[in-house]
A protein has these predicted regions:
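Surface-exposed patches in mature extracellular/periplasmic domains of secreted proteins
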Residues: 8-14, 38-40
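Acidic helix-start/capping segments at beta-turn-to-alpha-helix junctions
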Residues: 11-24
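Contiguous mixed-secondary-structure segments that line small-molecule binding/active-site clefts
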Residues: 21-22, 26-29, 34-35, 39-136
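Signal peptide-proximal N-terminal region
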Residues: 1-9
Length: 136
């Protein structure tokens, strides 16, 4: 449609080629697949700055604010340098909206987070919740 047939896309779902979501970046980097469409937050082990190119839980009021981040002077250059260091290029963001934080018990205030167990990607938000007493 957009390429006049010169570009062919074959989609693979649910880690069917590469294994875990965190491994997709490496698979694209090494040529096993041609493209990665996972969250940059999975790559915080390589460089903590990937957190800001990905999911910043609670960092924005709406997805458009994250898009606006790249318009800030120097931001696109910083993101390009981050990805280029690993032989990759960010060609666009897929931002589905706010991440939800759901619980089987009420969390009315910050002290209620103590000993709260939940699944979270590694990086900034896990460190923040840990500092508040949670167990990500």
């Amino acid at each position: 449609m957009f390429s006049g047939g010169s570009l062919k896309v074959e989609m693979f779902y649910s880690s069917s080629v590469t294994g875990k979501s965190a491994e997709v970046f490496n698979s694209a980097q090494t040529g096993i697949i041609d493209c990665d469409m996972t969250g940059a937050g999975y790559q915080t082990g390589k460089n903590a700055a990937f957190q800001f190119a990905g999911d910043v839980m609670g960092g924005y009021d709406n997805p458009y604010q994250q898009y606006d981040f790249l318009k800030f002077p120097g931001a696109q250059d910083a993101v390009d340098a981050l990805y280029n260091k690993y032989g990759m290029t960010l060609i666009g963001w897929w931002i589905p909206g706010h991440e939800s934080l759901i619980s089987s018990k009420p969390i009315p205030d910050v002290p209620s987070i103590k000993d709260f167990k939940f699944r979270s990607p590694p990086g900034m938000e896990s460190m923040i919740f840990s500092a508040l007493g949670a167990k990500p």
